[in-house]
């Protein structure tokens, strides 16, 4: 009679062990799922940040190009003005 009781206790112990193992595995799975969700959120945020960064850099690039063109035009105007100031009196003197 003690042998069936021992088998029942042994089987119950095995069931308890499997149950504990399953609880641990499910807990780890839920933790991993949470981590994957967090990583997905972070990667989406990084993607949005990269898109905003690219947009901003293109805006700045365009702005700097415009400033460069303006500066070039100002330099050309100053050079032309200087040439006019220098050449016109010389031409008038010889005419």
Swiss-Prot record:
Induction: Regulated by the srfA transcription factor. It is a single-pass type IV membrane protein. It holds the Pfam family Synaptobrevin. CDD domains: R-SNARE. Residues 1-70 are cytoplasmic. Keywords: Coiled coil, Cytoplasmic vesicle, Membrane, Transmembrane, Transmembrane helix. It is found in: Cytoplasmic vesicle, Secretory vesicle membrane. Belongs to the synaptobrevin family. Involved in the targeting and/or fusion of transport vesicles to their target membrane. This is Synaptobrevin-A.
